[in-house]
Amino acid sequence: MNKKSYLRRVRLPRTPADWLEAVMNFIFFLCGMLAVCCVVLISVYMVVSGVPAIHKIGLFKFLFGTKWASTAAEPLFGILPFILSSVYGTLGATILGVPIGLLTAVFLSKAADPKLRTVVVTAIELLSGIPSVVFGLLGMQVLVPAVAKAFGKASGACLLSAIVVLSIMILPSIVSVSVTALNAVPPEYEQGSLALGATDTETWFKISIPAAKSGIAAGVVLGIGRAIGEAMAVMMVAGNSPNMPDSLFRSVTLLTTAIAKEMSYAGGLQRQALFSIALVLFAFIMLINVVLNVVLKGGNRDE
């Protein structure tokens, strides 16, 4: 390609409007690169800070050890209880929150009166804006005593309380994304089903929800990401003991709460181990994002 043909393809700015366009494009490029740089820097920092402790402790002992005693004379750094507590807590919140969120989304999208829909949508939006510490405070003052009284336990600060709080916190993500997905279903699908004699309920569950499955799945994955990354609210209701989660009523520590609980006074290998926990948590979040992208791409191919 000679110089003249290149200049014809890439027009140099000549007018003030051209210069403004070039400047704005450069600003857009910088903003995009800033986001990329943030992700890269965080990833590098997590790896650099987290790998040394794993190297000293041993990968198998770190990931599959069942004892965490970071301040003992002979410290132990097994995070399997934290991993399982996070997995069980997230799974329980998903099992509890997804049906409620999905049914709420179907109601808002298909059945609700416009005035009632406005009220419910406003409430859900407010729910999404409530700080985590408020959820934790309400859980600590209301839910924890209720669990202890209902099940005859000395303390209600346990895995079950964490699951209930997390299930409430993930509702806005599931509901909002699912409503958008259900509203995007072509009305011809539902009209055809109704014309064949199906009831409204049959149409919603056999036509609308399957047609919106990729969007609903995206909402569920976003809710899972919110649940596994939550720290403050969970720390206030879970009990924060490094136990294996062999019961819903066990006091447990999650990956996030382990970091939040000990980082303020940690030093030496203990501090490095907390960064290693953060690296494991970061890997979980990255995996969830990959799953979300796969789900969205799969939905686009189906469409």
Regions found by a protein language model. Name each.
Residues 179-183, 187, 194, 261-303:
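C-terminal transmembrane helix and the adjacent membrane-cytosol boundary/short C-terminal tail
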Residues 100-139, 303:
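Cytoplasmic-entry segments and transmembrane alpha-helices of multi-pass inner-membrane transporters
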Residues 125-170:
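Generic hydrophobic transmembrane alpha-helix motif, especially the helices
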Residues 79-107:
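Transmembrane alpha-helix signature in integral membrane proteins
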Residues 1-31, 292-303:
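Transmembrane alpha-helical segments of polytopic membrane transport and secretion proteins
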